[in-house]
């Protein structure tokens, strides 16, 4: 029978009691009020708001807009002086028509611009922009990762980055093509704001789970033995025991039922959030396609679409601003790095020092290193293939905006199906997770290899196959979505098998940084190849190599060995921790004792 809260707690105001009760509080100032339906709605609302940018803008309309704005100001590659056409036809034209016979599709002429005297292909311009944005985003995400889990800034930063990204998209409406450099800056700001805000949004998830009424009830029952501890150690204690630190899973009571309940709820909330975000993205993508057709597929149509995406992002961030509680985290020991007005330095230094310690620990785990190396290449391939394919379809096949948007819709639908179908395929063929990932990689390799077929003379004479006709892009879009659904489902869970128990947050932070940081290289290399050869198709050779390289690395990963090494490292770190030395910190790395005296924001 579940024990009831003590009478002194029941006599207090419910909110005040939950804020003060020692069993539920892991650190002074923690807001342990039960997670409400309204607060969950606020959390879901931001996914509904921002996922539209990731899917519709970054995955489709933003690279097209950047290419078209530079094309409007560029000159033909062939003679370096004839201005490119400022219009983009929506129907087949002289250079894009396909007759009744299967003749090769001839795309619009290649165009270049000059930035600081350097000749850049208009398609490369978009790729370079994304590489720069990912670099800045990665540095920012690492620097503010401590703020995501410590102190009172989590919600404030979330809203600030959301506002920054949404306004950047809204401003596209007022940009004329001659301001294409400013458009690139806005794209960088928007992508940086999106990435940082989603890190902060994800940091709310464990807090919402921990304070769910069902979890709180279970925790109270499981922690009844701690009543004695808190009675003997009143709230005036000046330290928090390392075992209570947020980064570590609270397994001191060996309450596996509590851990399982939290994992189930976390998975449910995360899946719901992803599903809600994708539904919003599909709806907005379809609406944007209709808007583009209604406005005759001009450059203004693209800017209007980005304005709509930014407005959507801004409007649906409002419920998150109203309903999400600040939920302060434990304080960073700023005495080590900065005080007073320089306290913000402590967050940045703490984050980078913590990352370094996690990397040092990861070096002791061979299979973690193999997987992260494979994931570094694979995630770069995933991000690069998407942008490359859209720009190839526009500049080589002459596909109009609506047709390009439809590719993204097909990929999203296929991705949802892939998330479910790979589970069935794995079960049917009795595939281990590592082999399922290998199967996804092999299928992924089909995309660049298929594009390279267009170089073969006899294929070129056919006028079809090898990405010579627009309809082929839809087939490859479906394959891309299917692969992405499988990799998204399996890579994260597979990595979880290889990391030390109880150190999940710090290693998943390294996983996320590897994912985000890798994407700065692929687009830049594709851009350089496009500049060198004057077209995108040769870049498929690089993409084929980029996707192939993770294959042998993934085959070298030994799950049993990885689990054994991870367990040994966890036991060794726990032994060091028990002797009073540093261990692990929340969502980054360093374990430390946090001094009390912290007051967080309370609603």
From Swiss-Prot:
Keyword Transport: yes
Record-level GO BP terms: amino acid transmembrane export from vacuole; autophagy
Residue ranges crossing the lipid bilayer per the database entry: 46-66, 122-142, 157-177, 181-201, 274-294, 304-324, 342-362, 368-388, 401-421, 439-459, 464-484, 539-559
Compartmental location: Vacuole membrane
Record key words, sorted: Amino-acid transport, Autophagy, Glycoprotein, Membrane, Transmembrane, Transmembrane helix, Transport, Vacuole
Gene3D superfamilies, per database record: MFS general substrate transporter like domains
Source organism superkingdom: Eukaryota
Stretch forming the signal peptide: none
Function: Vacuolar effluxer which mediate the efflux of amino acids resulting from autophagic degradation. The release of autophagic amino acids allows the maintenance of protein synthesis and viability during nitrogen starvation.
Homology family: Belongs to the ATG22 family.
Protein name: Autophagy-related protein 22
UniProt organism field: Coccidioides immitis (strain RS) (Valley fever fungus)
Recorded name of the encoding gene: ATG22
